[in-house]
From Swiss-Prot:
UniProt-recorded Gene Ontology molecular function terms: aminoacyl-tRNA deacylase activity; ATP binding; proline-tRNA ligase activity
Any single biological process term in GO: prolyl-tRNA aminoacylation
Organism expressing this protein natively: Fusobacterium nucleatum subsp. nucleatum (strain ATCC 25586 / DSM 15643 / BCRC 10681 / CIP 101130 / JCM 8532 / KCTC 2640 / LMG 13131 / VPI 4355)
Subcellular location: Cytoplasm
Name recorded for this polypeptide: Proline--tRNA ligase
EC category: ligase
Chief localization: cytoplasm
Cited function: Catalyzes the attachment of proline to tRNA(Pro) in a two-step reaction: proline is first activated by ATP to form Pro-AMP and then transferred to the acceptor end of tRNA(Pro). As ProRS can inadvertently accommodate and process non-cognate amino acids such as alanine and cysteine, to avoid such errors it has two additional distinct editing activities against alanine. One activity is designated as 'pretransfer' editing and involves the tRNA(Pro)-independent hydrolysis of activated Ala-AMP.
Subunit comment: Homodimer.
Keyword list, A-Z: Aminoacyl-tRNA synthetase, ATP-binding, Cytoplasm, Ligase, Nucleotide-binding, Protein biosynthesis
Gene that this polypeptide is encoded by: proS
Amino acid sequence: MRFSKAYIKTLKETPKEAEIASHKLMLRAGMIKKLASGIYAYLPLGYRTIKKIENIVREEMDRAGALELLMPVVQPAELWQESGRWDVMGPEMLRLKDRHERDFVLSPTQEEMITAIIRSDISSYKSLPINLYHIQTKFRDERRPRFGLMRGREFTMKDAYSFHTSQESLDEEFLNMRDTYTRIFTRCGLKFRPVDADSGNIGGSGSQEFQVLAESGEDEIIYSDGSEYAANIEKAVSELINPPKEELKEVELVHTPDCPTIESLAKYLDVPLERTVKALTYKDMGTDEIYMVLIRGDFEVNEVKLKNILNAVEVEMATDEEIEKIGLKKGYIGPYKLPAKIKIVADLSVPEVSNHIVGSHQKDYHYKNVNYDRDYTADIVTDIRKVRVGDNCITGGKLHSARGIECGQIFKLGDKYSKAMNATYLDEKGKTQFMLMGCYGIGVTRTMAASIEQNNDENGIIWPVSIAPYIVDVIPANIKNEVQVSLAEKIYNELQEEKIDVMLDDRDEKPGFKFKDADLIGFPFKVVVGKRADEGIVELKIRRTGETLEVSQNEVIAKIKELMRIY
């Protein structure tokens, strides 16, 4: 491709709406164009990278034995009503009607569609297992689209779905997809971690995310320095270290003026936070039921764990009005001598604290020497604790934190959708069984953005060779110098013959202008044909390292091929 013929409109200044590196650089490099909030056109330069990522995904999915198909973007509402997710998905799912007033949705995901297809065609165990995938546009009406392609409303994803007759078969395919995703992200030149994750609205029994490591990542991931353990903060667990047990004492009501928080209470009574139990009130946003949630004073509640335990769509802290309406006193809530009927969820840490301090439901008073079992119990006792950096890992070592961008996720769905949508088969004995499902997604456009977040500097993008829109930029320093132009054309043609993606910057611009564009766009290699062109010598510049090599025109192709294997 000749730069003069390419559709590349670079910008000197960063548009005001851009906040993170990938958004800024894709706009400046002329890779995307914003058309509406969270909706972008992929311009030729950006689309080349998208296609390269898609090709890597296709090659590895095909290698893993999956079969490609293409499902529609518009789906009938009946499928979502059948699965039970028509109401669960909320306003993020865009609903629409056709001219006959029939309800449809603009696809946010494809579990319902693929299950409907498979159940109509497969009826015997002999046709299973099978894994089908497609690469398709998705739409999720995000409340607050931001960060460019990182959290847009329209995006490209690879979805794969597998169907099985046994848990062993599903487990095997889950590991197959884990290995496949590892190869995909490795080939894309990314630093990443597979981490245990929450399944969210998709559901199922097991899930892992593939987190691309970047300081700008929205997700916090937890990992051990002494084992392979890694998890999203929403799912992470750690060793619970309990305070020493004490002989049980009699409950006392103590005056605690101006101590509405657990920190102020512990300071006033001169006790460690771990000897207190804080009571929080949460509301199930689906049922409006209020719960009292108990946790040791030095810990925080993991709201995702709480949501899952309650089987809630979402949970939020109850308002002051809601708390008072059920007879509780904000700032002094506790489980002992409870004045209201309310279900209690307690963290595993709570029963292990002897003689703890809790609220009394009276302003400026607390109970001390309260003990679980003797003085109160909870309806549910389970892990709802948010882990902390420095905690002991359950598999050894200490826990650390990093930021990540979720670019892929794999799930064991089990029979959630097959039961809801009656996707069955006949087993070897002729008995009807529900299929077991797996689900495997990769955000293609997000992967492009994540790569930039991980690979950039003050001058622009630094593409890995495997997904760079063009690998080499050939630049004649002086477009009016026939020797330079002739040699640049020769190298350009030779690179094309070798099937290496190459751009010839044939614009009549100053060299510095061209160099800045090349660095902004992120070509892995620049071949600058300059003053030594008459000697057959060119400069080969490596974008990632900044290194410049002087290379003979007869060796430049071989050198580029060698460097491509490294970068």
